[in-house]
């Protein structure tokens, strides 16, 4: 089963597939060198990056992420403030300390970090890392970053994801989940909690939920006090801090009901600005869509009822259940299915989680998730300049409001829906596979070709 620990992972920006995954791959490679007993023999490491991972790699800091992974770092624990200085050192000296300083190798970046526009055979996000002794390659591994920070090596590509431990209520689709709920009388969150307890202790789960929510809230608090311009050639100004000041100073929520929308926008904008700046965020289910699930929960916390341990667990469990359906039966990779697999999935997850907190039945929860995705079908991934900024940041805000609307529509529906969640997931995947590669995180089409970056 794909666990809540798999869907919600603490990491760094700006991208789960292009930053978090590559860093994990770099770390895995040096772990393999240690396990094989050859780390201290290596004189040079060469990295080759392919497809979408290459085409938008510079804007997503893929090269930096791989280097930091080779150096022994992981996304959830890396010291973000130390990264610029470390990379400057590597660029200056052409040397790289592997595995937390265990061994130093040659690494002239211009020759050891190579970008290739063509795809490897199995996925759009491919990378190959090779260790050499002199001019002889002694170990090489190919990795694919398949979305949401998940990586898989070539030998294990296509194998079942998630834990092999038997859970009380196994499922492959939304129909299975609804059937289990109907037979047991459990809510969807209650059902998922029983599955999670087969994998983790109650204390572990509660701690994970608390850690995830703390990172989300810390991102909001950090972002609303930070202004200036985001990194990169686009020179995109941060907007969330100014928007919050405006909201706090006017406090029109009592006279203008639509002011709630402004708050939801602010919550989403601030987290995606933090992500774009390379800050600490939570994959939900990806970094490119990291603002939606927390923005909707922050809306609930501020305007409906203060979030407590119980409501936090219910929201996270349901959102991760929906995310797992897309992970199992479609994709959460923008390079594979476009932005519908990132922002669309996050919208679906958040809509379902909110519906659960608002008292929805399992069937209504799935309707909310279906609405959230149905109206993101065909959404392209065309980041300007290869950066997770335009249109990504605003898109998270729009999708957050859409998720709230989807949950409310599901709760107030009196007729049977014509489209079920499983069919919309199937449609999303087919649509993504039919989508021209220009619109799947390559920055070769759409807005990416219409907006001129600043020098």
Residue positions per predicted region:
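Extended hydrophobic packing segments that form well-structured cores
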Residues: 418-455
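Accessory "access/gating" subregions that flank catalytic or transport cores
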Residues: 200-338, 446-455
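Conserved phosphate/anionic-ligand binding catalytic regions in large, soluble enzymes, centered on
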Residues: 8-26, 277-296, 337-347
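Short alpha-helical scaffolding segments that buttress acidic/His motifs in well-ordered protein cores
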Residues: 7, 11, 264-272, 315-323, ...
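Alpha-helical support elements that line or immediately flank enzyme active sites
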Residues: 17-34, 294-306, 351-359
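C-terminal regulatory domains involved in ligand/effector binding and gene-expression control
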Residues: 75-253
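An N-terminal structural lobe/cap that precedes and organizes the functional/catalytic core
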Residues: 1-13, 36
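Hydrophobic alpha-helical bundle architecture
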Residues: 307, 318, 324-397, 409-418
């Amino acid at each position: 089963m794909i666990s809540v620990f798999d869907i919600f992972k603490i990491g760094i920006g700006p991208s789960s597939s292009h930053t978090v995954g590559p860093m994990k791959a770099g770390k895995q490679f040096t772990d393999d060198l240690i396990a094989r007993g050859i780390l201290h023999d290596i004189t040079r490491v060469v990295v080759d990056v392919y497809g979408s991972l290459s085409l938008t790699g510079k804007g997503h800091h893929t090269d930096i992420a791989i280097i930091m992974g080779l150096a022994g770092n992981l996304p959830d624990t890396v010291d973000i403030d130390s990264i610029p200085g470390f990379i400057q050192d590597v660029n200056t000296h052409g040397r790289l300390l592997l595995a937390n300083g265990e061994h130093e190798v040659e690494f002239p970046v211009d020759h050891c970090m190579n970008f290739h526009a063509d795809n490897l055979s199995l996925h759009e996000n491919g990378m190959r890392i090779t260790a050499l002794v002199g001019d002889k390659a002694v170990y090489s591994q190919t990795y694919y970053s398949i979305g949401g920070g998940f990586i898989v090596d070539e030998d294990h590509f296509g194998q079942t994801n998630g834990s092999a431990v038997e859970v009380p209520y196994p499922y492959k689709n939304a129909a299975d989940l609804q059937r289990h709920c109907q037979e047991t009388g459990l809510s969807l969150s209650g059902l998922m909690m029983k599955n999670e307890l087969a994998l983790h202790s109650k204390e572990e789960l509660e701690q994970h939920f608390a850690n995830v929510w703390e990172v989300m809230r810390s991102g909001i608090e950090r972002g609303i006090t930070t202004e200036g311009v985001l990194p990169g050639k686009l020179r995109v100004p941060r907007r969330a801090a100014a928007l919050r000041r405006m909201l706090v100073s006017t406090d029109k929520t009592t006279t203008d009901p639509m002011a709630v929308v402004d708050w939801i926008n602010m919550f989403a904008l601030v987290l995606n600005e933090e992500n774009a700046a390379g800050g600490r965020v939570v994959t939900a289910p990806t970094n490119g869509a990291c603002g939606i699930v927390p923005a909707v929960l922050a809306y609930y916390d501020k305007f409906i009822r203060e979030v407590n341990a119980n409501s936090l667990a219910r929201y996270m469990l349901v959102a991760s259940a929906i995310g797992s359906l897309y992970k199992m039966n479609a994709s959460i990779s923008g390079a594979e299915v476009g932005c519908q697999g990132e922002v669309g999935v996050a919208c679906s997850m958040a809509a379902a989680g909110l519906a659960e907190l608002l008292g929805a039945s399992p069937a209504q929860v799935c309707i909310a998730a279906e609405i959230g995705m149905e109206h993101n079908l065909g959404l392209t991934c065309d980041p300007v300049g290869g950066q997770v900024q335009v249109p990504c940041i605003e898109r998270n805000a729009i999708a957050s409001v859409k998720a709230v609307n989807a949950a409310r529509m599901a709760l107030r529906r009196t007729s049977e829906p014509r489209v079920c969640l499983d069919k919309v997931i199937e449609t999303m995947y087919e649509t993504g596979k039919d989508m021209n590669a220009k619109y799947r995180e390559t920055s070769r089409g759409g807005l990416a070709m219409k907006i001129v970056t600043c020098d």
